[in-house]
């Protein structure tokens, strides 16, 4: 549909690429940024902030981003991943867990090296977690069992005065 959201995003990306391409100097790279749902992106099972809108009707294909773009950095999906099998179209993922559904994710940023207008390499840089995410218990239990689980937690060796480093407990 010519008036759909996806078609509009496609037209906008084409125009922006043509504008940037016409003005760049030899050897300069074009880097695109987008905060959107891409077709084929893996979503968290139980995180509502990443839900596919209208069953994925507003998902944008990796082909929307011209092959002349050196790197397309996407945001909104919290799990690091490549899109459409293209190394240069990726979600870096969130640098910090945004919900308990991300407790087992590897959180990172992506460093992108560009030479002569092309990606020369990428490096995932893991972000250390400053506060643990603890789900106690891992599955529903009666209140007395939950209290038993909490009582069984080991005492921390050092209690930080900095509350931002205290664990998040669910």
Model regions and ranges:
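Extended recognition/assembly regions associated with phosphoester-bond processing machinery
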Residues: 1-170
């Amino acid at each position: 549909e010519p008036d759909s959201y996806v078609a509009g995003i496609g037209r906008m990306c084409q125009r922006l690429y043509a504008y940037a391409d016409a003005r760049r100097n030899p050897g300069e790279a074009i880097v695109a940024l987008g905060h959107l749902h891409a077709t084929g992106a893996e979503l968290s099972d139980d995180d509502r902030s990443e839900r596919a809108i209208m069953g994925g009707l507003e998902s944008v294909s990796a082909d929307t981003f011209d092959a002349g773009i050196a790197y397309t950095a996407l945001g909104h999906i919290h799990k690091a991943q490549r899109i459409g099998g293209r190394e240069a179209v990726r979600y870096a993922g969130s640098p910090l867990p945004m919900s308990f559904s991300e407790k087992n994710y590897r959180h990172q940023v992506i460093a992108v090296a560009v030479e002569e207008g092309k990606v020369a390499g990428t490096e995932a840089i893991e972000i250390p977690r400053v506060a643990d995410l603890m789900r106690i218990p891992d599955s529903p239990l009666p209140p007395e069992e939950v209290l038993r689980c909490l009582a069984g937690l080991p005492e921390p060796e050092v209690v930080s005065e900095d509350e931002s480093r205290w664990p998040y407990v669910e």
